[in-house]
Structures are given as structure tokens and as C-alpha cells.
A protein has these predicted regions:
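Short catalytic-loop micro-motif centered on adjacent basic/acidic residues
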Residues: 8, 78, 136-139
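Hydrophobic pocket-lining residues within nucleotide cofactor-binding pockets
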Residues: 11-14, 44, 110, 144
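Active-site catalytic loop in hydrolytic enzyme cores
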Residues: 84-145
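Cys-nucleophile CN-hydrolase/nitrilase-fold catalytic domain and related Cys-dependent amidase chemistry
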Residues: 18, 27-98, 103
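N-terminal phosphate-binding loop and adjacent alpha-helix
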Residues: 10-28
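Short loop/turn motifs at secondary-structure junctions
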Residues: 5, 33-34, 135
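Extreme N-terminal starter segment of soluble prokaryotic enzymes
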Residues: 1-8
Length: 145
């Protein structure tokens, strides 16, 4: 089985400004080709903030942007965002395929030293899916298997 080529992107995030952060990532993604997976930072739309879900972009907008980038790069685009959901605010790791299929995982082990557990609902299930012949188990910073 061929290996996966993975790129991990990092940048100083504009605090609590989703559109500005997406513009920065647009520029970073312009010339990336030949990758299987591109990973964005935790809470890539807002920065790691406890109140981020209250000011976050709607999930549909984040997924639409990720889908466009997945199509542009022909890669799985992955990154977490603070989102409001029917269960309350979550730190949701989204993984979007070029064809539009969306996988998601809600962070299970919240970072207590930053009081993340007081601001976000913990996920309650492991997610495993296949991408280009590889089984992928998404995790977010501080998650433990």
C-alpha cells in the first residue's frame, strides 16, 4: 500500500476572526499539490479560546470552505473548529474529502488546565474511517487513545 503524503499547516491566528484566518489559509494552500492529507491547527478559525464557539462561524460555512480547499488540492482537509451544535459548544475535528464527504469527531478529552471542560461538551465516541486505503482515527490535542 502506498504511503500518505501529509502537510501540516501552522500560522499565527487572528484571534476570534474566522474570515481573516481562512484568508490566511487560502494563501498557504494556493500552491500545495500532491498531498493526500492537509491538517490545519486546532480551532483554526478562532484560535484556542474558551468562548470561541459563541463567536464561531457556522459549521456549514466552515465545511463549505474546507470542501472547496479539498477540491482545489485533491486532498483530505482536516482541522478542528469551535462550533455550536445541538449538544452545545464542541471542539469538532472536521475532515472533508474532495468529493464532499464529511467526517467529524468531537474532542473527547478536554484540557482541564485551561477549563475547556467548563466551556465545551466532550465527545462520546471514537471515529474511524478509511481514506485512500488507510484507516484514520482522528484525535485533537490532549486526546488520549
Amino acid at each position: 500500500m502506498p504511503g500518505l503524503t501529509i502537510s501540516i499547516l501552522q500560522q499565527p491566528l487572528v484571534w476570534m476572526d474566522g474570515p481573516a484566518n481562512l484568508r490566511h489559509f487560502d494563501r498557504q494552500l494556493e500552491d500545495i499539490t500532491g498531498r493526500d492529507v492537509i491538517v490545519l491547527p486546532e480551532m483554526f478559525t478562532t484560535g484556542f479560546a474558551m468562548e470561541a464557539a459563541k463567536q464561531s462561524m457556522p459549521q456549514e460555512e466552515v465545511v463549505a470552505w474546507m470542501h472547496a480547499k479539498a477540491q482545489q488540492t485533491n486532498a483530505l482537509i482536516a482541522g478542528s473548529a469551535a462550533l455550536q451544535t445541538e449538544r452545545g459548544p464542541v471542539n469538532r475535528f472536521l475532515l472533508v474529502e474532495p468529493e464532499g464527504k464529511v467526517h467529524f469527531y468531537d474532542k473527547r478529552h478536554l484540557f482541564r488546565m485551561a477549563d475547556e471542560h467548563h466551556h465545551y461538551e466532550a465527545g462520546n465516541e471514537r471515529v474511524v474511517f478509511e481514506w485512500r486505503g488507510w484507516r484514520i482515527l482522528p484525535l485533537v490535542c490532549y486526546d488520549q487513545i
